[in-house]
UniProtKB/Swiss-Prot annotation:
Pfam families tied to this protein: CRCB
Top-level taxon in the UniProt lineage: Bacteria
Regulation affecting activity: Na(+) is not transported, but it plays an essential structural role and its presence is essential for fluoride channel function.
Highest classification ranks of the organism: Bacteria, Thermotogati, Thermotogota, Thermotogae, Thermotogales
Record's subcellular location: Cell inner membrane
Organism in which the protein naturally occurs: Thermosipho melanesiensis (strain DSM 12029 / CIP 104789 / BI429)
Positions contributing to Na(+) binding: G75, T78
Protein name: Fluoride-specific ion channel FluC
Gene Ontology biological-process annotations: cellular detoxification of fluoride
Amino acid sequence: MKFILIAIGGAFGALFRYFVSKVFNTHFPFNYIPLGTVIVNVLGAFLLSFVLFSSIERFEVNPNFVLFFGTGFLGAFTTFSTFAYETLSLFLTSPFRALVYFFANLFFGFFAAFFGMVLGRGKFL
């Protein structure tokens, strides 16, 4: 049963990642860095942090929901492999753009996770 929840969540997460990346890369073209990947990674960092900290400190969350949404959906929605590939790809043409992209993912991802933690816990640190 757990594998099915993760697989279904993963299928939805992968489809949603494709949709979000396509929308941001098509309708909000920002040719300096691949914005779609930054958006999905930052949004995923926020959501996972929010859900996990909420479930630990404020609400009783069904463990099956955490498997479906956290492991399945958000695991497939966020993408470290695409981030790594795009960073190296950018590095070949513009090392500076690669650094901007790399640090944008890290900075905004950690900021989003921190913000998700604060909102999930309902208190600052």
